[in-house]
Amino acid sequence: METTPIKPTAADETTPSAEQSSNRSSTAKPMSASLREKLKRSRHSFKSPLSVVKRLKIEDDTEPQPSQQGEEEKHGVKDDRDSNVTETDVNRNDMKLQRDSNHTAELPSQQCEALRKAVKERTETLRRLKMVKMYRKKNDLNELQRLTDKWRSCAQSVLYELQRELATGGKQASLSQLIDSFGINDKLLHFDRTEEDFTDT
């Protein structure tokens, strides 16, 4: 009569392992204090590689990319060129203004003096014309002419009389000397020096 083999049950299979674990736990020695302190230190000093990778990734992200650096350098060069061009234009304008001012300051002093003299003469002529215009408005020209002729006749008579009174040693003073001593214009008296006499007498 054949006998069938008996298969071991799960309880039978687990029984030795349980026994082994119980034996191990019973045979395990308690951990010493120095060993526990070393384990604590090793835990604190241990660094996970994931944290190192994360830190490296963040640092890489913060660093500028080569393309960004190239663009920034291009913009920087362009800004420097623009600033250099602006400074060059400003310097050229300053030099031009300085040359113009120097050219103006180099005007000859003789030319300035001639201009001042011309302005003074024109001002005096304008003043006299205004006076003539004013007298013409206020007075009659015929009356003025009559008074001028009367004054000339009186002046000529006085000069003749002075010439006779001032004669010394039978020698009379010339009319030219008398007119020059009084500072009278020959044209006002109608006096001719070549003839040494008045033209309207």
Swiss-Prot record:
Protein keywords: Coiled coil, DNA damage, DNA repair, Nucleus, Transcription, Transcription regulation
InterPro entries per the UniProt record, alphabetical: SFR1 (IPR042429), SFR1/Mei5 (IPR018468)
Pfam families hit by this protein: Mei5
Gene3D superfamilies in alphabetical order: 6.10.140.1020
Subcellular localization, as worded in the UniProt entry: Nucleus
Primary location class: nucleus
Annotated region (Disordered), positions in chain: 1-111
Aminoacyl-tRNA synthetase listed as a keyword: no
Biased segments, Basic and acidic residues type: 71-103
Ribonucleoprotein keyword on record: no
One annotated Gene Ontology cellular component of this protein: Swi5-Sfr1 complex
GO molecular function, one term: transcription coactivator activity
Compositionally skewed regions (Polar residues) per UniProt: 12-29
Alphabetical GO biological process terms: double-strand break repair via homologous recombination; positive regulation of DNA-templated transcription
Coiled coil: 109-131
Known role: Component of the swi5-sfr1 complex, a complex required for double-strand break repair via homologous recombination.
Family statement: Belongs to the SFR1/MEI5 family.
PANTHER family tied to this protein: SWI5-DEPENDENT RECOMBINATION DNA REPAIR PROTEIN 1 HOMOLOG (PTHR28643:SF1)
Subunit structure: Component of the swi5-sfr1 complex.
Name of the protein this chain belongs to: Swi5-dependent recombination DNA repair protein 1 homolog
Organism: Danio rerio
